[in-house]
Amino acid sequence: MIESSVLIKHRWLRTTRSQRCFLLLERMDHVLRACQTLCRHLPTMVSGMVVLVFASLSVQAQLAQVLPQRALKQWNIPPGNYSGITPLGNGHYAVVSDKAPRLGYFEWKIEQDSLTGQVKQVIPLGFRPLQSPATGGVADHDAEDLIFDAQHKLLWIANEGNQTLTAYNTATKQKVGALDIPPYLSSDSVFTNLGFEALAYDVLTRQWCSTSESPLRVDAPARPEGLSPTAPLDLRLTLWGSTFSAQRILPYRMAAPQLSRQARHYLHGVPALCFLPNGALLVMERELSVPRAYIGAKCHLRLRCIPADAMQLAERLGSRLISSSVTDSLVFSPSLLHALAPQTQVMDVAQWRTHLDVFRRSFANYEGMCLGRRLADGRQTILCVSDAQDGVGRCGVHLRDFLRVVVLDRECTD
């Protein structure tokens, strides 16, 4: 029989610094003792696995606190296709829609509780167009994410429609620059509608990070819905430097799928990225499964973190690019990607699932995230926004837009 006192001294707990983890040790002890009763009726190996799973889950769940989602409708914000969010400063946020009538962003003022982080109020301040119609403001676009460079007053937009990462001056509203896109991330290299969904910016190192939503054509034989459930989903997180050219690739392996792929709509990919104040990279993974009858739809979200020291280690392991002009001959083969991706250190921070069925109508397809306010106790909040597809629905059931706050434990950002 496995003694609970031994498990509480397990290395996972000894290396965990969360105060809430220590407060839960007593509760975990009760859980483990209950497991011991079950263990008497199970083989030794199986019982050990059961207890270790309980211990692992109890510790893992303490890296963040996921707060209840808040519907934007209560603040008279109309349904939209909100796909990205970024802080502008002083509680103001820019929100981009992938179906906006023209290129631009919505500005919201978001008030959060200083103790809990929960959203108290959202005030819509209008739509801010970028570029005049004469300079291409009504051109075909699919704005999926955005980041704000406060030092240079630039708003960078990830456009999946033409696979570009473009900067706009917030004063003149005009295009002023763009990141060089390496050939492996060109429109021809990504599966349809699985291109640039995410964009992040690190103010400390002044580097950008983006990726295709799902594996590239060269790295996977089919879209996620056409792959075996055991097939690895590896991405090339690409980082750009101050010269606007791609500098290196960070191999990244997504978590194993949890939902059924036999569905009307199925998605599995990375819709958002966010650099934390300490240089760590937060990755949002979204898996969505919508049955043919719609009832039973699920959206499973994960927040995973690549620690700052792991980012530096990956820099040494990853492939360095001399310039975007030579990336055609890049010796970063799919086999090398699949070999390196599992070596990138990743921490599971939080996860949640939304549903649409007879009794639950919490379904929300989260696509964007950014830094929220710091709480009074120093913890960092993350704001997540969902895409309701303009309130699509039928028979009186329509999707709603939500904001959800995730409160990170101090070890994620210190």
Task: Pin down the residues of each PLM region.
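Serine residues within intrinsically disordered or low-complexity segments
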Residues: S4-S5, S18, S47
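Sec-dependent N-terminal signal peptides
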Residues: R40-M49
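N-terminal signal peptide c-region/cleavage motif recognized by signal peptidases
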Residues: A55-S58
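Sequence/structural signature of beta-propeller domains
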Residues: Q62-D414
